[in-house]
């Protein structure tokens, strides 16, 4: 109840950030509310509505709370501004969206799947009309024959664009678009590795996942350098891709009349085969076995990335693999999954959130201060945003993964409440005592207050509500 009530303040209308500016001009901004990423720092203007944040939060904030019309509007507005096969990172009321995120698209597709499965509209949504603001011919003439007419067509277009490969330079690249980024950071590239089914992307000069802190301190020497580029095949993107492929491959052809994509080599790859390749290769590529040669003493966990430019970053223990576990548990060996989750529980889970980096890593810096003007590169201007501070939203996915792989006791009944609730006692206290009646974006080390974080964050509330909702749904079935 407290979590559900906490979602209400994020959905509102504001003159500077309607969901879609063109529609606002026609209907008046009061009729076009949008979902704020966090309060008060992400309340207005182009910083209010983020694709990634929106679709991580949508299930908890809008679907579980039965606000299906709001969820539908949000999905269709973002659908209308897909470009290059990508969902925008910053929506900017659909005026000048920015397409510099590799993961926002996959959270968007997961949100479509969730909407179809949870809303009364169901699969009928797949035939809903979609009209792109920027037609396919403007950004990839090779795919002009796939100009979408429906949501189903749009999903196919996105998957086809990734299978073919995505390569473009951000529009208006330069200091006017991003005052911190270096020239190479504006180049956006994504590719499919046909043999394994993995999607790779990014480079060491940009940061296309949620761990997106770009350095800005000339004094400390981190300006233009991403703290966590995570280029390569990021584990949560692989999980979200698998979830999407499993879903579309299993749909009736009447709801999803597309069976295959064409890869960059010209080969036809069916969705069922793509799904199977991921299933076949995931454990081999991501599991760090006891006998593996690795630049870390840790074993029995899942890599954060495969194929990073800085190859040792593949082996960093971060809270991203539970996201993949929650949306695509079939990828994981149950025995390996339990070992990895136990390690994460020991090393990463804090009082309210999860450490964004293993505290035993040399790069770990657990306290975030955005106003740090020191000469220490590792923390100057908050460069350590995702190098230790404890973010709340990944915990929701961790709890769902934990319940899936540890959720049965020896008698076969649910152990979910017994295991999960102790992790949530401090959240309940926070909801009752916070002036915002909400949960924060993140905390500093060991759960200490971070004054530079939002005290109310949509995805923090949403993923924990989702975890509890899923737990109760499972127990109701039993």
PLM ranges: what are they?
Residues 1-478:
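Acidic, mature catalytic/reactive cores of soluble proteins
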């Amino acid at each position: 109840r407290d979590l559900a009530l906490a979602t209400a303040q994020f959905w509102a209308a504001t003159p500077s950030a309607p969901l879609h500016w063109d529609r606002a001009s026609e209907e008046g901004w009061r009729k076009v509310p949008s979902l704020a990423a966090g309060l008060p720092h992400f309340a207005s203007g182009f910083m209010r509505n983020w694709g990634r944040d929106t679709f991580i939060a949508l299930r908890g904030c809008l679907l579980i709370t039965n606000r299906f019309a709001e969820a539908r509007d949000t999905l269709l507005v973002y659908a209308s501004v897909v470009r290059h096969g990508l969902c925008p990172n910053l929506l900017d009321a659909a005026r000048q969206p920015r397409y510099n995120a590799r993961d926002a698209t996959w959270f968007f597709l997961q949100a479509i799947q969730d909407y179809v499965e949870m809303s009364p509209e169901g699969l009928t949504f797949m035939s809903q009309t979609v009209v792109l603001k920027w037609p396919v011919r403007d950004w990839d003439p090779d795919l002009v024959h796939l100009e979408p007419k429906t949501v189903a067509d749009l999903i196919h277009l996105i998957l086809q664009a990734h299978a073919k490969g995505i390569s473009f330079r951000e529009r208006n690249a330069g200091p006017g678009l991003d005052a911190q980024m270096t020239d190479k950071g504006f180049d956006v590239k994504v590719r499919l590795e046909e043999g394994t089914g993995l999607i790779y992307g990014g480079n060491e000069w940009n940061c296309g996942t949620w761990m997106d802190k770009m350095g800005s301190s000339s004094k400390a020497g981190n300006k233009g350098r991403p703290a966590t580029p995570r280029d390569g095949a990021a584990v949560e993107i692989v999980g979200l891709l698998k979830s999407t492929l499993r879903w579309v491959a299993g749909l009736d052809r009447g709801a999803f009349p597309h069976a295959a994509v064409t890869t960059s080599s010209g080969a036809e790859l069916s969705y069922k085969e793509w799904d199977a390749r991921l299933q076949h290769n995931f454990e081999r590529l991501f599991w760090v076995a006891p006998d593996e040669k690795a630049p870390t003493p840790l074993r029995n966990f899942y890599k954060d990335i495969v194929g990073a430019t800085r190859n040792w970053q593949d082996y960093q223990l971060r809270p991203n693999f539970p996201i993949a576990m929650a949306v695509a548990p079939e990828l994981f060996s149950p025995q390996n999954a339990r070992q990895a989750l136990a390690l994460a529980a020991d090393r990463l889970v804090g009082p309210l959130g999860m450490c964004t980096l293993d505290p035993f890593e040399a790069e770990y810096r657990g306290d975030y201060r955005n106003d740090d003007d020191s000469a220490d590169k590792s923390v100057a201007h908050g460069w350590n945003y995702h190098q230790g501070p404890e973010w709340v939203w990944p915990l929701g996915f961790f709890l769902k993964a934990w319940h899936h792989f540890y959720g049965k006791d020896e008698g076969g009944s649910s152990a979910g409440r017994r295991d999960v609730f102790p992790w949530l006692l401090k959240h309940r206290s926070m909801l009752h005592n916070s002036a915002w009646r909400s949960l924060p974006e993140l905390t500093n080390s060991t759960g200490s207050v971070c004054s530079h974080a939002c005290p109310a964050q949509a995805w923090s509330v949403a993923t924990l509500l989702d975890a509890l909702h899923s737990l109760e749904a499972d127990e109701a079935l039993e």
